[in-house]
Amino acid sequence: MLSSAFIAQINEILAPDEVEKLCLTLTETMPPVSIRLNPKKLLTPPSKCPSPYVEPQPSSGAFDLLALKDGRVPWCSQGFYLKQRPTFTIDPLLHAGAYYVQEASSMFVEQAYKRILAESEPQTLLDLCAAPGGKSTLWRSLLPDGALLVANEPIRPRAHILEENLLKWGHPDVVCTSAFPAEFARLKEFFDVVAADVPCSGEGMFRKDPNACAEWSHKAVAICAQRQWEIIRDIWPALRTGGFLVYSTCTFNQKENEEMLVQICRELGAQLIEIPVEKAWHIAGSTLQSNARPMPVYHFFPHLVRGEGFFLALLQKTSGTANHQEFKSKSHSPKRFGMKETFFKTSTSKFVPTTEPQTKSSKTTKRPAPKLDPTTCLSESQHFQLLSTGETIFAVRQTLFQEVQQICSTVKTLHAGIPLAELKGTNLVPHPALALSSEFNTNAFPTIELSYPQALAYLRREALTLPANLPKGHAIASYLSHPLGFLNNLGPRANNLYPQNWRIRNL
C-alpha cells in the first residue's frame, strides 16, 4: 500500500494520469526479469566435451537460460529480458560468472560510459557504493583491458558479497576495497570517473522491496539526501578536474535527484553533460517545473519503461575547490600488499609443500618458500606482476602495478587483480577464484566436465566420485566448459575445494 504522503509527492512531479499509471504499476505488477551476459564468458555450449576424463551426462533438471530470452535491453549491448524468473541459484553458469542478474534500468550506465568516451578514454574508475556488484561488473565489461576498476563498499558484510561477485565475473583489472568515501581523499585527483549509486529512499524499488515502501517517509528522504551530499562532497577530491561523476539513485523525488545535482554543481564545481537517448526508450527528463532549459537528467519510471525506478545524471568536474576537511586516519601499511617477485620460482611441480614428509626415522627438512610456476596458471603471465597480502598471492597487470599499490596502501583492500594462490598450512594451493579468472590457463590442470547434477553437488560442497583415470592432485571442476573451481584428487577420495561461504545452502 502506497502512503498518501508518497502519492502527494509524486503528484508534484508527474501529471495526474501519469501518477495513476505509476501507482498501479508499483502495486499491481511484477518487476521484469533481466540478465546481462559476461562478454568474456559467453554462453555458447560446446559441441563436445573438452575433458578426456569424463563424458558429459544428460543435464537432468537443468534449464536453458538462452531459451528464456525475451528481447534485448535496448540501452545495454549485453542485456536481455527473460520471459520468467527461473531459480537462478540452481544454474551453475550463474556461479561460473557467465552472466549477472541485473535490473534493466540500471544498465543505462552503459550509455553514460559511451558519452564519456566522446570526451576521453578513462583509465581509472571508482564505483563508490558498489555492492552487490551489478553496476561494477557492467563497468568492468565496458572498460578496456588495462583500465582499472576500483569497486568499493564501506559496509563489510556487503563488501564480501561484492568481492564474491567480482571474483566470479573474473576480470583481472579490478581492485575491491571497503572504505568510506572520505578515506579516498588522500588519492588526490586519482580517478578519471567516479560512479556513485548513492544510498537512497528506494522509491523505485517498491515492487521488489516491500520494506522500502513501508519505511518511506519525508524524513527518510531528507536523511538520505544529507547522506548523499556528504558522500559526494567527501569523494570530490579523488576525482580529477575534468573527470566525470556518474550520479544515480533508485528513487523519483527531486530532493535526492535534481536538487542534489544543483547543489553539487553550485558548491563543488561541476556541469551536467547530456547523454543521447532514443525516444523509443521512453526515458523521462527533469521533473523540475522551470522556464529554464531542462536539466539533462534521466528518469526511469516503471510505468513507462520495462524496468524499475532509476535516476541517472552525468556531471563533469570543473573545479577542484571545495569546503572539505580531509579524512585523517591511520594509513594502511604498504607492506600489507608487498611485491613478491622472488616468491615464485620455476618448478616441475605446480604446487610443492614447504616441508618434506616427516617419518619416524627423519626430522622435518625445511625448504625455502613454496614454489609455483605462474606461467602455468595464467594465459599471458608475462603481463602480470605479483603482490602478496598475508597468505594470499595476487597477480596484477604490470601497467597497473603502481596504481594498485597506491590504492592498497591507502584504503582497506579485499583483493587486487587475480587471486593466484594461498598458503594452507605448509602447502601452496591454487586460490578458488583463479579458476574463475578470464586469464586462467585451463591447460594448467586436468579438467573434469561435470553433469548438471554433479555441478550442483559440487556447488553444495558435496563429495564427488571422480573418474579412475583422473591424475592425482588439483583438477578443475567445469560445467559446459565454464570452470567452477578446484578439486583435489587424492586417489581413493577427492576434496571439494569450493569456498565454504560460496556454497549453495538451500535448494
Residues covered by each model-derived region:
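Conserved SAM-binding loop of SAM-dependent methyltransferases across substrates and taxa
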Residues: 132-145
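Conserved AdoMet
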Residues: 33-45, 65-107
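A short acidic, Gly/Pro-enriched loop at the edge of an enzyme's catalytic core
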Residues: 121, 185-195
